[in-house]
Amino acid sequence: MSRYRGPRLKIIRRLRTLPGLTNKRPKSRNDPTNQSSSRKISQYRIRPEEKQKLRFHYGLTERQLLKYVRIAGRAKGSTGQILLQLLEMRLDNIIFRLGMALTIPGARQLVNHRHILVNDRVVDIPSYRCKPRDVITIIDQRRSRAMIGKNLDLSQKDQMPNHLTLHSSQYKGLVNQIIDSKWISLKINELLVVEYYSRQA
């Protein structure tokens, strides 16, 4: 299954808030989000819906998400927590969480177009797994600085997660550590995602 490129609000109405996909919100009047939240979701539907939340928030194909689930399953510890850590430490997500891009698709575009440096080297792979002590900067071009500077000004001024440090005047971000689960911005029951894939096996 390919990466979704259709209307983003359509997904938000069905799955509710996905900050990585879009910062837009459906109109409050007759908002299907409010209607669907009061409707009891069957156990049959809830697992695939949680899986879809993860897919659309992080902008993954079905094959990519399955690959991450398998990697998490082979690691020691909670498969669900490790899965979220793997996704949060992707370069495109790190750029989004730093505020250098307003969405994860926007961050992916910055990476693909070679605007991003990791430890002073151009990295054009959005799935690159960041690690503690990585330094994220941008190429020294006027266009890159203007674009990312605008994103930094427009990004929501939420508290920066403790695994990251941003030096906005230098267009630089630091990865301090692996993310702690309490700083994951997506409201998700990751265990249901793991259960979904275990039932598919």
Curated annotation (Swiss-Prot):
UniProt cross-references to PROSITE patterns, sorted A to Z:
RIBOSOMAL_S4, S4
Its subcellular locations are: Plastid, Chloroplast
Where is it chiefly localized? plastid
Q: Name one GO biological process term.
A: translation
Q: Where is the composition biased (Polar residues)?
A: 31-41
Coiled-coil segments, which residues? none
Query: Which InterPro entries does the entry link to?
Result: Ribosomal_uS4 (IPR022801), Ribosomal_uS4_bac-type (IPR005709), Ribosomal_uS4_CS (IPR018079), Ribosomal_uS4_N (IPR001912), S4_RNA-bd (IPR002942), S4_RNA-bd_sf (IPR036986)
What molecular function terms (GO) are annotated for this protein? Answer: rRNA binding; structural constituent of ribosome
Alphabetized Pfam families for the sequence: Ribosomal_S4, S4
Any idea which UniProt keywords this protein has? Chloroplast, Plastid, Ribonucleoprotein, Ribosomal protein, RNA-binding, rRNA-binding
Taken from the UniProt entry, a GO cellular component term is: chloroplast
Sequence segments annotated as region (Disordered): 20-43
**What are the S4 RNA-binding domain coordinates in residue numbering?**
89-157
Q: What does this protein do?
A: One of the primary rRNA binding proteins, it binds directly to 16S rRNA where it nucleates assembly of the body of the 30S subunit.
Its subunit composition reads: Part of the 30S ribosomal subunit. Contacts protein S5. The interaction surface between S4 and S5 is involved in control of translational fidelity.
The entry sums up its family as follows: Belongs to the universal ribosomal protein uS4 family.
Under which name does UniProt file this protein?
Small ribosomal subunit protein uS4c
Query: Which organism encodes this protein?
Result: Cycas taitungensis
